[in-house]
């Protein structure tokens, strides 16, 4: 595939090059045919460092015209070099990135950085550089500035995607003469430093490389080099050029160019200069000691979001007004300022105009949200993103509570989640933190200033006004996301106090394990009950030694008595008792399965104990439940390797697509999708609406939600091959405590879906009661992530009456017998909460198995002293460099896609072993380095990395991908939404008119709060904010599924909390059930009735917050109408 940008590039790939050729010979040959000085650079790749050339080369010509002539000569077979006919094709990258058009290579410009002052025409100039080189690389979609400072050369790189507006300007007084261009930026630019000494560069004097200019250096990433941290503080770049009018055609091609010319006045910004490494932050000294921290945090957040400028935020009149308000009033007004779509140049005026209306509304607003959040197990959390040059304060945002923050809830504003990210908020790449320097024949890593910046912030903390946030700990998921918890120590509680409260970590001499254990209690969890030490018994682990390797069959599994399990289930808000809970209890971590014969509350094993702790709160992170089962690319890859035909997967996907096909029009089809794909959530409001008689396309709210569900499913099919496996479940693993199961056997009892209850095909089920059955026969079992063919296990699912008596349900019971535990055979899993893919669909059960991989991990390095915080900080930053999980997974998929042996190929087996080491890196501290030889050179079309060399995949992945694309292409275009929304009179309750004014007030409050969430999270419409499914995501979310998943969770939590708050308004406004029906009907009326649609921005979801009440009204009205019709019929007779 050749992209459009490659044709605008002056570089070509030359094939069929003699392997005896050197750069000088190829240069002379090409310039003999094309003319002198027509080659800018060339390189002949070598298999070893500067020897053994390969049979192709890359050549970068000086112009596109020269490139075209060379391609013509090649097509005419006129480039004959020593009997070798040189063949030219498009290259996917330049050797030296530089503009092809010489007019886009500007020298001697003046670059001024700063931000707007009191209006758009006044520019607060922080720093100015003369003699700057500016390259506009349209092909690379970026602008580069080369700046010389204190004898060093730096490159400032601005991506087109980060430019929010481009303007032509006059800065020298003559309004008719354009002499500058202003770039307004969303994010900070990347900064590089030019380095020549001891760095292995691509261009040096050797036999296989040539460059016309002196490029014997390397750019390495660095932090803000300016003494006043002006780059980090700036949001705009102003470029002063000669003859600006003649440059209009070039600069008007930059993103979001505005036609009118701006007369710009520079204002000295020296007062905003800062020597601190964390910028931009308001100078706390001007605020005074009594200024509330919460308001200071929001002012900084507004500056970082570019809702107000740093100049406006420092205005003493604004500070005086905010200081004179109540804290709650000030925060509400600043939240309204966050909702502005563009920068507010006069926040003083904005605050003054909002004061009266906000105070009036607050008199009728409900009490503090703290109780409501606590009931939902939600906490409010401050966030900070730290980039190489800036800081961004965000929030507070809602997320699931953890035990640590909940225990210190009175200090919740002293906690902060800090994430280290790239300038555009994407994952910070390893080469930004470390580069390889060469000394003689040896290569060693050199840490960059960005590495030192992260390490310094972990050690010194972040100061925001009166608070200094210092490192506290990080959980395993935070480590993978380059995030930590920080805490602002105060007179009552210090960060060290919290760590001591969590437990004793001094016995752990491994840095990586010590760090992991510190983060154990930060897992999102629900706090249930205190369990005294005397109510806990220690039970032995079940272990075996096979071929010198030690295995633990009971690794991570314990027991809970039935009586206590009932109490825990009640605390979790469950109406039933699950078979097992995943828990954190003091220093214990794992799963506790219900034991009906136990009289001790908890029975725990040594394998569950990670550190000593005096905490006695039982924290529950999840419990066993019936979860739908899906294939993904990893599982399909291994099943295909083991002999499952491509047609099987294509047929399963076709069934999935067919199921989705009619859900937007057919009620039964919609019910089928919701009940099959939604697991425990199938009895939700949408299902109730469908069962009540609404057609998918007739009710606007129902139609909107079904459409989102439909599009999400199609997207996941296309991007992940997430194909439903009806004959399967995702189940938490438990152990056979009675020792009944033999090696190779499992016990699986599941809650049946509605489709399974209706189906007559029960050959693989043994019915237990009306809702559950035991699976009988062969099952395929694995655990994600899985890369080795041996991760797929085919086991015998059996019925055993003793397990039925124990009540095990919606979990998989593994044996305690054999040479090795089955969970360990599946990707090195254990029983501390791992979830297993289990399917009894004979179409995807292989007839053969490969031996499982040896998952004996590296031994962690032990220190001869207590682990220090400094060592944990260094481990955190080193992990950022060596986290290769994603790269390894992608490489494995690409090699398996192309190699006839698939996942059994040597490269894939090497990558599976590397992946195992990379997974264990967080515990062992031993990184898994990705060899260059295993890195893919081309990528299959289904990965959609079209900026890279791409090929058409002929494997099962390519077939599945193109089948979904074809299905999407055949979809009917969505009908344009009508101005009028269908109004259902059967939802009217007699007397609802008396509640219309109350309903309007509630509707407007809901609309304002939902709009605020939409703006904050970047949701384009109501359906996106309700589901968290963003169609147009920020680039950093599109690249990182983990980050997107986390944000999606926070969005749904925020909406859930808003709905809970709205329910509070509803309950408070009603005295009895009859009034609830009237108010619910009024909610519906002011939202859907055409007479009220245009009053305010109306959201269809508002009345359906009380959907159960509305459906009761509908049912009663339908029943009343039915009785009246019967009565009328009898009268007529």
From Swiss-Prot:
Its EC number is 2.7.7.48. The gene is RDR2. PANTHER family: RNA-DEPENDENT RNA POLYMERASE (PTHR23079), RNA-DEPENDENT RNA POLYMERASE 2 (PTHR23079:SF5). Pfam families: PH_RDR2 (PF24823), RdRP (PF05183). InterPro entries: RNA-dep_RNA_pol_euk-typ. Mg(2+) binds at residues 830, 832, 834. It catalyses: RNA(n) + a ribonucleoside 5'-triphosphate = RNA(n+1) + diphosphate. RDR2 is non-functional in the absence of associated Pol IV. It is found in: Nucleus, Nucleoplasm; Nucleus, Nucleolus; Nucleus. Interacts with NRPD1 and SHH1. Associates with Pol IV complex, forming an interpolymerase channel bridging their active sites, through which the Pol IV-generated transcript is handed over to the RDR2 active site after being backtracked, where it is used as the template for double-stranded RNA (dsRNA) synthesis. Interacts with JMJ24. GO terms for molecular function: DNA/RNA hybrid binding; metal ion binding; RNA-directed RNA polymerase activity; single-stranded RNA binding. Belongs to the RdRP family. This is RNA-dependent RNA polymerase 2. GO terms for cellular component: nucleolus; nucleoplasm; nucleus. The keyword Nucleotidyltransferase applies. Keywords: Magnesium, Metal-binding, Nucleotidyltransferase, Nucleus, RNA-binding, RNA-directed RNA polymerase, RNA-mediated gene silencing, Transferase. It comes from Arabidopsis thaliana (Mouse-ear cress). Disruption phenotype: Late flowering and absence of siRNAs derived from FWA tandem repeat regions. Loss of de novo methylation. Increased expression of retrotransposon-derived solo long terminal repeat (solo LTR) and SDC due to their derepression; levels are even higher in the double mutant rdr2-1 jmj24-1. One of its GO terms (biological process) is siRNA processing.
């Amino acid at each position: 595939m050749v992209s459009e940008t490659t044709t605008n590039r002056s570089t070509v790939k030359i094939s069929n090059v003699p392997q005896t050729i050197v750069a000088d010979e190829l240069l002379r040959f090409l310039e003999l045919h094309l003319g002198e000085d027509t080659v800018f650079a060339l390189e002949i790749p070598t298999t070893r460092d500067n020897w053994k050339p390969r049979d192709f080369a890359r050549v970068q010509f000086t112009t596109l015209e020269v490139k075209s002539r060379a391609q013509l000569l090649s097509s005419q077979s006129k480039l004959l070099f020593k009997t070798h006919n040189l063949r030219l094709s498009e290259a996917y990258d330049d050797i030296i990135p530089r503009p092809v058009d010489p007019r886009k290579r500007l020298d001697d410009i003046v670059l001024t950085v700063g931000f707007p002052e009191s209006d758009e025409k006044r520019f607060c100039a922080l720093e100015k550089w003369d003699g700057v080189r500016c390259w506009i690389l349209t092909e690379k979609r970026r602008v580069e500035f080369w700046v010389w400072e204190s004898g060093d050369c730096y490159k400032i790189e601005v991506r087109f995607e980060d430019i929010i507006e481009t303007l032509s300007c006059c800065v020298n007084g003559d309004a008719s003469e354009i002499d500058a261009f202003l770039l307004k930026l969303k994010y900070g630019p990347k900064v590089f430093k030019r380095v020549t000494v001891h760095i292995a560069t691509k261009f040096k004097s050797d036999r296989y490389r040539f460059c016309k200019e002196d490029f014997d250096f390397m750019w390495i990433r660095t932090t803000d080099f300016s003494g006043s941290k002006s780059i980090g503080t700036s949001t705009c770049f102003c470029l002063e050029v000669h003859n600006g009018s003649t440059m209009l055609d070039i600069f008007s091609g930059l993103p979001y160019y505005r036609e009118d010319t701006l007369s710009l006045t520079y204002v000295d910004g020296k007062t905003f200069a800062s020597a601190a490494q964390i910028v931009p932050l308001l100078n706390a000294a001007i605020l005074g000691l009594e200024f509330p921290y919460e308001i200071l945090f929001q002012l900084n957040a507004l500056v970082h979001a570019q809702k107000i400028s740093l100049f406006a935020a420092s205005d003493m009149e604004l500070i005086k007004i905010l200081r004179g308000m109540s804290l709650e009033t000030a925060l509400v007004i600043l939240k309204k300022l966050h909702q502005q779509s563009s920068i507010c140049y006069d926040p003083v005026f904005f605050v003054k105009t909002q004061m009266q209306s906000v105070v009036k509304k607050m008199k009728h607003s409900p009490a503090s949200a703290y109780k409501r959040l606590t009931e939902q197990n939600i906490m409010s959390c401050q966030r900070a993103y730290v980039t190489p040059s800036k800081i961004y304060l965000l929030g507070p945002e809602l997320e699931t509570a953890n035990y640590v923050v909940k225990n210190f809830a009175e200090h919740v504003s002293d906690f902060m989640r800090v994430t280290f990210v790239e300038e555009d908020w994407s994952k910070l790449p390893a080469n930004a933190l470390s580069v390889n320097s060469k000394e003689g024949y040896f290569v060693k890593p050199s840490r960059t200033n960005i590495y030192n910046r992260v390490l310094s912030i972990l050690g010194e903390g972040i100061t925001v006004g009166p608070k200094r946030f210092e490192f506290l700990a990080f959980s395993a998921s935070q480590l993978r996301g380059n995030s930590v918890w920080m805490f602002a120590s105060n007179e009552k509680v210090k960060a060290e106090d919290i760590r001591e409260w969590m437990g004793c970590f001094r016995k752990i001499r491994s840095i990586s394990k010590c760090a992991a254990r510190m983060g154990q209690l930060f897992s999102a969890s629900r706090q249930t009950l205190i369990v005294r030490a005397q109510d806990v018994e220690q039970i032995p682990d079940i272990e075996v030694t096979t071929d010198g390797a030690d295995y633990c069959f009971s690794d991570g599994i314990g027991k809970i008595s039935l009586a206590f399990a009932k109490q825990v289930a009640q605390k979790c808000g469950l109406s039933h008792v699950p078979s097992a809970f995943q828990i954190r209890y003091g220093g214990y971590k794992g799963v506790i399965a219900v034991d009906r014969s136990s009289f001790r509350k908890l029975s725990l094993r040594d394998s569950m104990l990670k550190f000593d702790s005096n905490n006695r709160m039982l924290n529950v992170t999840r419990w066993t439940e019936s979860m739908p089962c899906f294939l993904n690319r990893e599982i399909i890859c291994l099943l295909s390797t083991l002999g499952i035909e491509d047609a099987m997967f294509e047929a399963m996907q076709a069934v999935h697509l067919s199921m989705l096909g009619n859900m937007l029009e057919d009620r039964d089809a919609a019910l089928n999708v919701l009940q099959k794909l939604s697991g425990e959530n199938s009895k939700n409001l949408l299902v109730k609406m469908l069962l009540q008689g609404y057609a998918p396309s007739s009710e606007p709210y129902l139609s909107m939600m079904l459409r989102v569900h439909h599009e999400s499913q199609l997207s996941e099919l296309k991007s992940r091959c997430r194909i439903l496996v009806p004959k399967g479940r995702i189940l938490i693993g438990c152990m056979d405590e009675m020792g009944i199961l033999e090696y190779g056997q499992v016990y699986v009892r599941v809650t049946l879906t509605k489709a399974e209850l209706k189906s007559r095909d029960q050959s693989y089920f043994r019915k237990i009661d009306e809702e559950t059955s035991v699976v009988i026969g062969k099952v395929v079992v694995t655990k994600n992530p899985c890369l080795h063919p041996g991760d797929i296990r085919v086991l015998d699912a059996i019925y055993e009456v003793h397990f039925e008596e124990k009540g095990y349900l919606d979990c998989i019971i593994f044996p305690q017998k054999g040479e090795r535990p089955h969970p360990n055979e599946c990707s090195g899993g254990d029983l501390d909460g791992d979830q297993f893919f289990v399917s009894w669909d004979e179409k995807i059960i292989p007839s053969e198995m490969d031996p499982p991989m040896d998952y004996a991990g590296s031994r962690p390095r032990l220190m001869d002293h207590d682990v220090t915080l400094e060592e944990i900080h260094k481990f955190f930053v080193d992990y950022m460099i060596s986290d290769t999980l994603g790269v390894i997974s992608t490489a494995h998929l690409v090699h398996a896609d192309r190699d006839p042996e698939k996942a059994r190929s040597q490269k894939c087996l090497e990558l599976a072993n590397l992946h195992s080491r990379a997974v264990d890196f967080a515990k062992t501290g031993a990184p898994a380095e990705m060899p260059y030889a295993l890195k893919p050179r081309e990528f299959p079309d289904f990965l959609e990395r079209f900026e890279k060399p791409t090929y058409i995949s002929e494997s099962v992945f390519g077939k599945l991908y193109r089948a979904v694309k074809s299905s999407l292409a055949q979809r009917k275009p969505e009908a344009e939404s009508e101005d009028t929304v269908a109004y259902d009179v059967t939802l009217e309750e007699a007397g609802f008119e008396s509640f219309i004014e109350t309903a309007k007030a509630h509707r407007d409050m809901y609309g304002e709060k939902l709009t605020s969430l939409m703006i904050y999270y970047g949701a384009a419409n109501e359906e996106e904010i309700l589901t968290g499914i963003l169609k147009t995501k920020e680039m950093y979310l599109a690249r990182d599924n983990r980050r997107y998943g986390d944000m999606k969770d926070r969005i749904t939590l925020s909406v859930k909390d808003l709905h809970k708050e709205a329910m509070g308004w509803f309950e408070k406004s009603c005295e009895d059930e009859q009034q609830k029906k009237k108010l619910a009907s009024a909610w519906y009326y002011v939202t859907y009735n055409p007479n009220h649609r245009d009053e305010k921005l109306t959201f269809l979801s508002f009345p359906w917050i009380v959907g159960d009440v509305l459906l009761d009204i509908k049912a009663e009205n339908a029943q009343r109408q039915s009785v009246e019709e019967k009565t009328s019929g009898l009268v007529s007779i």
